[in-house]
Every structure is written in structure tokens, then in C-alpha cells.
Amino acid sequence: MEHYISLLIKSIFIENMALSFFLGMCTFLAVSKKVKTSFGLGVAVVVVLTIAVPVNNLVYNLVLKENALVEGVDLSFLNFITFIGVIAALVQILEMILDRFFPPLYNALGIFLPLITVNCAIFGGVSFMVQRDYNFAESVVYGFGAGVGWMLAIVALAGIREKMKYSDVPPGLRGLGITFITVGLMALGFMSFSGVQL
């Protein structure tokens, strides 16, 4: 149990997808203008990562890994296309659920919901799972932790950006300029966790 707790904390803070690996920056910067919308997208990313990482773990270990289906057959060259297909299917299912049961959130996320399919934070989580050879339980914990870490980062940035509306930002830095500086400072803050051994 201690191993899973340390993996969860590590994936949220130490190896934060957005602020340590800078994955998923497109939606991270574009949607982080309002906390409510950021939280909604963050929840969607948590759900997709929590499901996509373990499902792709099963697909990898039962089908794609060397000697998984037949002795001497290695289908690992299909990793990328298979993982992207599974992620796309999961995002489509999530999109249909949000459209049916949460129309305001669906409308607020707009084009960024289908973009979760190509959000490199999702694919990065799946790739790290394969690279680190996580078992099924570890992949569930890692997927959830990576999603929560990304959500924490985007909600924190949205809160800061909402407060910055009332700040006297120099004209040359208004908009994305000050946002990039803010993200850099947040990343420096998260770098302080890099020396923590769990």
C-alpha cells in the first residue's frame, strides 16, 4: 500500500505532467482563463487518464508486448497507433456522456474536449506507463495521479490568471506573455519537489 501512495504523490507533485514535463500545454494555456472551465477540463483529463492508462496497460501486456499473443511475435511497433486509438475512443465516449448529462460543461469546453484525444499529457501518461513497466494496479494509480496533478496545475494557473485581470501588467506582457512567466514560476515551485525521495 505504501508503494501505491508514494506513486500517487510522485505522479501528482514530483512528476507533474504540466509543470515538470510540460505536456498538454496547448489546452493548459488556452483553457486556463476561468477556474470553472479549467476544473471541468481537469476532471475530464483525470477521467481519461485514469481509464486510458490501465486500458492501454492491458492492451500492451496482452496483445502488443513481445511474446504476448504468440511466441516470437512482437507487435510493439503498433504501440503508438493502438494507444492513440484507445485514447480517441475513450474521449469520444466521455464527450457523448458530457453532451448528454452536462451540457453547460460540454459547451464551455468547446473544441478543447476533442483535443484531449491529441493532448500529449494523455499520451505521455500512457508512454510513461510502458517505459516504467507498471503493472495494472500501478497504472491505475499512476493514471489517476497524473490526471490530478495536471488538474491541480491548470486550476492553480486559472486562479492566478483570474486574479491577474485586476493587476497592472506591463503592456508588452499582457495576455500570453505574463501567462508564460507565471507557468515558469509555477514550474520552479514544483521543481522543489524533485529532490524528494519516496
Swiss-Prot record:
Broad class of enzyme this protein falls into: translocase
Catalytic activity: a ubiquinone + n Na(+)(in) + NADH + H(+) = a ubiquinol + n Na(+)(out) + NAD(+)
Protein family per UniProt: Belongs to the NqrDE/RnfAE family.
PANTHER family in the cross-refs: INTEGRAL MEMBRANE PROTEIN OF SOXR-REDUCING COMPLEX (PTHR30335), NA(+)-TRANSLOCATING NADH-QUINONE REDUCTASE SUBUNIT E (PTHR30335:SF1)
Lineage: Bacteria, Pseudomonadati, Pseudomonadota, Gammaproteobacteria, Vibrionales
Subunit field text: Composed of six subunits; NqrA, NqrB, NqrC, NqrD, NqrE and NqrF.
Keywords: Cell inner membrane, Cell membrane, Ion transport, Membrane, NAD, Sodium, Sodium transport, Translocase, Transmembrane, Transmembrane helix, Transport, Ubiquinone
Pfam (any one): Rnf-Nqr
InterPro entries: NqrDE/RnfAE (IPR003667), NqrDE/RnfAE_oxidrdctase (IPR050133), NqrE (IPR010967)
Biological role: NQR complex catalyzes the reduction of ubiquinone-1 to ubiquinol by two successive reactions, coupled with the transport of Na(+) ions from the cytoplasm to the periplasm. NqrA to NqrE are probably involved in the second step, the conversion of ubisemiquinone to ubiquinol.
Keyword Translocase applies: yes
Subcellular compartments: Cell inner membrane
Recorded topology in the membrane: Multi-pass membrane protein
Name this protein carries in UniProt: Na(+)-translocating NADH-quinone reductase subunit E
A Gene Ontology BP annotation from the UniProt entry: respiratory electron transport chain
Main localization (coarse): membrane
One GO cellular component term: plasma membrane
Domain of life: Bacteria
Species for this entry: Vibrio vulnificus (strain YJ016)
EC numbers: 7.2.1.1
Bilayer-spanning residue ranges: 11-31, 39-59, 77-97, 110-130, 140-160, 176-196
Keyword Nucleotide-binding tagged: no
